[in-house]
């Protein structure tokens, strides 16, 4: 999980979703997991 100020999709399988007021990226590739911090 990478914590970043600005997050974006890395590949076409990345999905931007909102959980508990935080924007996170989920993907089939575990290296692409991100959270806005």
Curated annotation (Swiss-Prot):
Top-level taxon of the source organism: Eukaryota
GO biological process: translation
Family annotation (InterPro entries): Ribosomal_bL36, Ribosomal_bL36_sp
Family from the record: Belongs to the bacterial ribosomal protein bL36 family.
NCBIfam families attached to this UniProt entry: rpmJ_bact
PANTHER family: 50S RIBOSOMAL PROTEIN L36, CHLOROPLASTIC, LARGE RIBOSOMAL SUBUNIT PROTEIN BL36C
Protein name: Large ribosomal subunit protein bL36c
Organism: Nicotiana tomentosiformis
Native organism taxonomy: Eukaryota, Viridiplantae, Streptophyta, Embryophyta, Tracheophyta
């Amino acid at each position: 999980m990478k914590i970043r100020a600005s997050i974006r999709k890395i590949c076409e399988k990345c999905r931007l979703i909102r959980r508990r007021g935080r924007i996170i990226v989920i993907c089939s590739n575990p290296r692409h997991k991100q959270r806005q911090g």
